[in-house]
């Protein structure tokens, strides 16, 4: 049996539950801690958005990830980080198509947001 890197198109909450993902920055000279997202019990979602920690209730519907009831810390960071963080959180709130493979999660917003699996976090 041959297996590729992309999903078969079937992504649901059970596929992502108990997993942790870290944003793979295009710019390797990033000065800030990378964005992280975790999917927990009852599909609660939490993570770090670049400047602030966030949490909310996740749902996967028709191949899109939605996060509602988002709460977050309120630190003020540099304008570029704040803009990147806000774009990420807005994308989660309005819903974003996603692709999933064993070690990669891609959020297909205005641009592709690539995340790699953080191994050992929930093992």
Which role does the model predict for each range below?
Residues 5-123:
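Lipid interaction determinants
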């Amino acid at each position: 049996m041959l297996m590729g890197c992309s999903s078969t198109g079937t992504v649901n909450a059970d596929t992502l539950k108990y997993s942790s993902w870290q944003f793979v920055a295009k710019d390797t000279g990033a000065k800030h801690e990378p964005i992280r997202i975790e999917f927990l019990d009852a599909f609660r979602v939490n993570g770090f958005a670049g400047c602030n920690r966030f949490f909310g209730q996740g749902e996967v519907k028709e191949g899109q990830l939605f996060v509602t009831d988002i709460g977050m810390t309120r630190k003020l960071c540099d304008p570029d980080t704040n803009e990147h963080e806000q774009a990420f959180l807005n994308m989660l709130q309005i819903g974003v198509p996603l692709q999933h493979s064993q070690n990669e999660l891609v959020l297909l917003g205005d641009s592709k947001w690539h995340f790699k699996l953080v191994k050992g976090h929930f093992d």
